[in-house]
């Protein structure tokens, strides 16, 4: 698991000082004192973690903003799935805030991350209470919480969450693409034709 650490957090950020120390721990390409503000921007820009904090300073507009950038949501195959996945995260965060949930153990988060990356839905995941269960069962509960969170946030879902429920039954996009490719090969297609079939995956 330690070999797959791109984006992974070893622990939650405890404060802005903690965050800055982590950014500073990586090599900087600008060390000139006059260029330190630019060095910080570049340092944060090359701090490849799933969550990072950026700062927007526009004195002429009296704007001094801290922006939390989440890089957790991976790009989806289609726009409807993209909307569904972002809707899930918005709803899930709203649920956690409304219910005042505690943060999961970071080790469980990283184990889930590793398991999902390597095994997709064919694995076991840790739930928010530390219980270990089948990925599809854990994720079904998470989608339900996201739906509740969207209600808390007064955001109407016209059916995007159904795409995520369907995915629990049909498999991930990667599963479907692999199935299309393998079926094509079994039917005698060459690799290029089979690959095209695999890439023809679309939301129905």
Regions found by a protein language model. Give the residues of each.
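Generic alpha-helical secondary structure signal
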Residues: 16-17, 23, 32, 99, ...
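Intrinsically disordered, low-complexity N-terminal regions enriched in serine/proline/glycine
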Residues: 11-12, 18, 27, 125, ...
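C-terminal regions of mature proteins
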Residues: 136-204
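Intrinsic-disorder-associated interaction segments
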Residues: 2-12, 37, 41, 132, ...
């Amino acid at each position: 698991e330690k070999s797959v650490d791109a984006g992974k957090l070893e622990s939650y950020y405890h404060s802005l000082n903690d965050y800055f120390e982590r950014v500073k721990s990586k090599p900087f390409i600008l060390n000139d004192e006059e260029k330190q503000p630019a060095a910080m921007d570049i340092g944060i820009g090359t701090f490849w973690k799933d969550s990072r904090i950026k700062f927007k300073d526009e004195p002429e507009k009296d704007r001094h903003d801290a922006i939390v950038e989440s890089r957790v949501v991976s790009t989806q195959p289609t726009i409807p799935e993209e909307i569904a996945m972002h809707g899930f995260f918005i709803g899930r965060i709203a649920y956690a805030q409304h219910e005042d949930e505690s943060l999961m153990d970071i080790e469980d988060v990283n184990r889930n991350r590793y398991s999902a990356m390597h095994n997709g839905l064919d694995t076991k995941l840790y739930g928010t209470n530390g219980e270990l269960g089948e990925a599809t069962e854990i994720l079904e509960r998470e989608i339900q919480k996201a739906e509740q969170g969207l209600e808390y946030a007064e955001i109407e879902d016209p059916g995007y969450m159904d795409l995520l429920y369907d995915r629990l039954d049909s498999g991930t996009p990667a599963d479907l693409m692999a199935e299309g490719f393998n079926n094509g090969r079994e039917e005698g297609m060459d690799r290029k034709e089979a690959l095209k079939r695999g890439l023809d995956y679309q939301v129905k």
